[in-house]
């Protein structure tokens, strides 16, 4: 039996069923819990996609991810416009596809407001954003919240900004521990996509995670951003993997499909697979083909092939 075809048929059925439930006017409590589509057996690495990279309505993006066989989805701040009923609706739809939500973002408008980790005068506003994101994480059963360092403060030394980042992270981690949610800090490039961003080095992000030294503060290692800013992301990957909860994937230059640029994805995936890593690998690229579902299927298939080849037979991805 073709399991990929079977799972796709199942997702098509569940999507239709979810739509009928929601259009019928019945409440979530009146409906039986959906049966999730199971991930690959014995998987220890979970595939995900950052939904902002996909075209369409939010519902269409979810359907695209499900049709591609992706196991989880990442949000920015789409939930900000949701009512309690909307939150329940989307939890139901996502579960009906056999997926879950793995991350949301705190301080989505960090470029526009003084909410950075690197300036002590921004700290209370930053912590207020963390509290707000934690409340939504609990509502949506999201285990992780992405933190952005914020931009360089021109009137502060690099050392002072780094010290502030560590202190802000420690304060936020206390809040996250109480909520049983994990904070993950992301490296970004300032050369192309995010001019002025402070935490542009995976090595420095790793240093901060080690210094905070708490299981609720981890690293979101964006391989694309590291390549654009500093070159080959592989050396830091080999050191960082015990501290990473999420890897982000896009090729450079262009931030498009893996395999369309210069990055050596087979080597990167092999290193992740051999490392014993047991977290998320999330696609955060802008699909080149018109058919974004086919693009995601190709990317996920290549990723799983390399990961599985690198892992022991008992622990496939």
Language-model segments: residues:
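Short glycine/serine/threonine/alanine-rich loop segments
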Residues: 70, 99, 142, 181, ...
């Amino acid at each position: 039996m073709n399991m990929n075809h079977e799972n796709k048929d199942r997702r098509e059925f569940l999507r239709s069923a979810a739509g009928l439930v929601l259009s019928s006017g019945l409440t979530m409590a009146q409906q039986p819990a959906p049966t999730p589509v199971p991930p690959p057996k014995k998987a220890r690495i979970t595939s995900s996609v950052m939904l902002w990279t996909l075209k369409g309505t939010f519902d269409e993006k979810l359907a695209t991810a499900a049709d591609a066989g992706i196991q989880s989805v990442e949000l920015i701040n789409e939930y900000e416009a949701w009512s309690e009923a909307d939150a329940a609706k989307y939890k139901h739809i996502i579960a009906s596809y056999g997926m879950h939500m793995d991350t949301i973002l705190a301080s989505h408008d960090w470029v526009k407001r003084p909410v950075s980790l690197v300036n002590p005068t921004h700290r209370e506003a930053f912590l207020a954003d963390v509290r707000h994101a934690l409340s939504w994480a609990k509502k949506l059963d999201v285990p992780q919240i992405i933190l952005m360092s914020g931009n360089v403060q021109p009137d502060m030394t690099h050392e002072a900004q780094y010290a502030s980042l560590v202190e802000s992270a420690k304060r936020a981690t206390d809040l996250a521990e109480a909520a049983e949610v994990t904070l993950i800090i992301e490296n970004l490039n300032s050369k192309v996509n995010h001019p002025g961003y402070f935490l542009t080095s995976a090595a420095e992000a790793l240093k901060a995670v080690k210094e905070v030294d708490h299981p609720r503060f981890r690293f979101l290692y964006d391989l694309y951003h590291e390549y654009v800013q500093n070159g080959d992301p592989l050396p830091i990957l080999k050191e960082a993997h015990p501290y990473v909860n999420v890897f982000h994937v896009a090729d450079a230059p262009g931030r498009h499909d893996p395999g369309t640029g210069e990055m050596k994805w087979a080597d990167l995936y092999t290193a992740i697979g051999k490392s014993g890593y047991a977290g998320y690998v999330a696609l955060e690229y802008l699909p080149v083909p018109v058919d974004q579902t086919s693009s995601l299927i190709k990317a996920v298939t290549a990723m799983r092939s390399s990961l599985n080849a690198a892992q022991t037979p008992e622990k496939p991805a």
